Amino acid sequence: MTEISILNDVQKIIVLDYGSQYNQLIARRIREFGVLSELKSHKITAQELHEINPIGIVLSGGPNSVYADNAFGIDPEIFELGIPILGICYGMQLITHKLGGKVVPAGQAGNREYGQSTLHLRETSKLFSGTPQEQLVLMSHGDAVTEIPEGFHLVGDSNDCPYAAIENTEKNLYGIQFHPEVRHSVYGNDILKNFAISICGARGDWSMDNFIDMEITKIRETVGDRKVLLGLSGGVDSSVVGVLLQKAIGDQLTCIFVDHGLLRKDEGDQVMGMLGGKFGLNIIRVDASKRFLDLLADVEDPEKKRKIIGNEFVYVFDDEASKLKGVDFLAQGTLYTDIIESGTETAQTIKSHHNVGGLPEDMQFELIEPLNTLFKDEVRALGIALGMPEEIVWRQPFPGPGLAIRVMGAITEEKLETVRESDAILREEIAKAGLDRDVWQYFTVNTGVRSVGVMGDGRTYDYTIAIRAITSIDGMTADFAQLPWDVLKKISTRIVNEVDHVNRIVYDITSKPPATVEWE
């Protein structure tokens, strides 16, 4: 099969974005069934969808009311495409509203529902095949459907929601008031799988090998015979991008590894050894540590740090690219979650991301972001599919701004050194305990807080280091890792004894949400 025929033969389920911070989880769950799923704007037209030729469409949740003046709508012709459609929460209400039903504030029809609720199935449905008649689901709605459109019938309800699941099988239209994409809906994965496989007819044959073929084709068509510049950060994402780009365009790729003085312990030498030596990437190493640290002096605001670093990275690339001939593209390791956290057209910005929000307006390159439709676990799977060794693929995630966002407040060499050394100890002990595959991400943070301590016979007034360790599947949500006490005790003892200017260790037990993974 040729690469072009692979591209044309890929089955897709499109998720239309109506503003939920977690609507991308829908796409992520569907991909788990071996089906490519992508997020598109709710403004997409029926003609544009027809050209994409998806086998299914999902209308996501969102914060608006469908009857409000500023409500996000839908091209009504989409309902006439003959493509199966699943409306989730706002999506179900939108289907109802547009096709002649009625949606009102929940107080006029039952109560608002936020949290787990029991769904009672009243009829059999292909959408709920293999799931129990009563099941826990996550509700999050302030409006409710009171009248369903002609041709629809009730499938399920809850104590506070008269229409929790509806369908029109003749037109292949389905609506559910709850969120199957979150783990709190116990059978949510089964419901989404039923929609993808049983209703949409997905083959379930999407894989990272397909992705590699597609992305290589896209890269070659985009780049042609021109050259690409890639900034290596030392993290998994940029490393995978480097190997993928080299596979696609070979020596048209030049990598710049910028040592901004904000790297982990021995990171520079490790990057050069792994990617420059083993994989033969053409890497230019630039020591710009003084340049970055001078700009960051006395800067405390995390958003300013990110913007400064994002801008300066590109200016460094600009300086280096000016020494090269014919470089037109800048490649980045931006992930789906990076774009999500920076806010989409319909979702509130949580924080700007260094790969999407810190670029200067006068940037001289076109962007290539091969991973911007992938989640972190998919990037690791891609790395394995590309033949990268596990020690690279499972390397701890590291943000582009580096240790700058793991030092609270103003950055100093002393603070940076406390994070470098404590982080190295943490990673070493987690690996020794055999937990490095169980804990999704772990690192240390200099909190900027000093506290009184006693060492030997003397009083100390030194920094407090926080340990952050989380478990997650895709980075969209996360729980703090419940590390064994003996492991935590050993880590704490080593850091206090081996790292200068530190006398207290605390453990971050906050999940995401409400917190983000990084502290800044």
From Swiss-Prot:
Active site feature: C89, H179, E181
InterPro entries the UniProt entry points to: Class_I_gatase-like, GATASE, GMP_synth_C, GMP_synth_GATase, GMP_synthase, GMPS_ATP_PPase_dom, NAD/GMP_synthase, Rossmann-like_a/b/a_fold
Reaction(s) catalysed (UniProt annotation): XMP + L-glutamine + ATP + H2O = GMP + L-glutamate + AMP + diphosphate + 2 H(+)
UniProt pathway: Purine metabolism; GMP biosynthesis; GMP from XMP (L-Gln route): step 1/1
Gene Ontology MF terms in the entry: ATP binding; GMP synthase activity
Domain Glutamine amidotransferase type-1 span(s) in chain numbering: 12-205
Residues that, per the record, bind ATP: S233, G234, G235, V236, D237, S238, S239
Keyword ATP-binding recorded: yes
Disulfide-bonded cysteines: none
Pfam families xref list: GATase, GMP_synt_C, NAD_synthase
Top-level class of the enzyme under EC nomenclature: ligase
HAMAP family referenced in this protein's UniProt entry, alphabetically: GMP_synthase (MF_00344)
Subunit and partners: Homodimer.
Record protein name field: GMP synthase [glutamine-hydrolyzing]
Organism field: Streptococcus pyogenes serotype M2 (strain MGAS10270)
